[in-house]
Structure formats: C-alpha cells, structure tokens
Amino acid sequence: MGLLSLIRGLKKKEGEARILVLGLDNAGKTTILKALSEEDITTITPTQGFNIKSLSRDGFNLKIWDIGGQKSIRPYWRNYFDQTDALIYVIDSADSKRLSESEFELTELLQEEKMTGVPLLVFANKQDLVGALAADEIASTLDLTSIRDRPWQIQACSAKQGTGLKEGMEWMMKQVK
C-alpha cells in the first residue's frame, strides 16, 4: 500500500471523502451537483472557478469540488488534486465534436501522479438529448477498458431528468468506503 492510499484510508475512517468533479465546459458538472443536492437546476451559469458542496451519503460527509471546465481554467485543475478520494468526469454525450478534446483532458488527468489509483466515475450526461452517444460508445471512444490502475465506471445519465445519477453515486460510494 502506497503513502497516498494510506492517507486516503485515514480520511475514510473519519467518514469524509473529497470528490473532484471535472469535465469540459458545458458538460453539465454544476447541473449534476445541483441535482444531487436537490437544488433548482432551471438556471445554471458557467462556473468561473469552483463550487464546493457538502453532501451526506451513507453516513459519509462528501466534499464535492465542482471545477470550471473552460479551456482557460483547465491548467489550474491540478491545484485541486491533493487528497482526492474519487474523480467524477462529466461528458456531454450529445456533443460528439468535443469528444476527442474530452478524451485528451481525461487522459492527461489520469496520468497525474496525485491522481494515481483514484477511482473514476464517468457520467455520460445529456442522454435525454437527440443524438446523444450511448455510454458504451463513449467508453470505447475514451478507451476506458484500457484503464488498469484504478476502478472505473461509466454511467449514462441526464442531470436535467435526474436519471442515472443515483446509480453512479452508489458505485462511487462503494469505492470511497
């Protein structure tokens, strides 16, 4: 067991987990976070910087960090990697033109030393939109099956309809416990 795993284990005993939510701009990160918090999702504005939410799930206090996905903000993502217990990466399933850009960013993230072994949940968001790619198509495009150094899961969802979020979070909670 490495030092990072040991530190993460200590945090789990305290009943806390730090979750990082990343993805390209307009993927639906903030909408997902608000839906999980049971907040109004009718008016969402692009995140400039970050949002932090505390949620209680299964006796755990989750600190969820939603970081803006604009190209100008992405270089700062690494400032938030310390003590991350799980990564939620959000994909806009209806925006196939930006899938390769999203793949590049995810690949870069997974190569970061501070993210070694951190469980990955990919939310294939916006499944309610016409032309949205299925989760298995996105998994194939992102080459998720080649990931061997961490547990991962892809979950089809629609933040606006609230579908798939519960299932994704249940998987994630099993990983951080």
Swiss-Prot record:
Q: Which gene encodes it?
A: ARL3
Please identify the protein, giving its name as recorded: ADP-ribosylation factor-like protein 3
Taxonomically, which superkingdom?
Answer: Eukaryota
Q: How does it sit in the membrane?
A: Peripheral membrane protein
Give the SUPFAM superfamilies listed for this entry: P-loop containing nucleoside triphosphate hydrolases
InterPro entries from the UniProt entry: ARL2/3, P-loop_NTPase, Small_GTP-bd, Small_GTPase_ARF/SAR
* Localisation per UniProt entry: Golgi apparatus membrane; Cytoplasm, Cytoskeleton, Spindle; Nucleus; Cytoplasm, Cytoskeleton, Microtubule organizing center
Question: Which Gene Ontology BP terms does the record give?
Answer: cell division; protein transport
Q: Which family is this sequence assigned to?
A: Belongs to the small GTPase superfamily. Arf family.
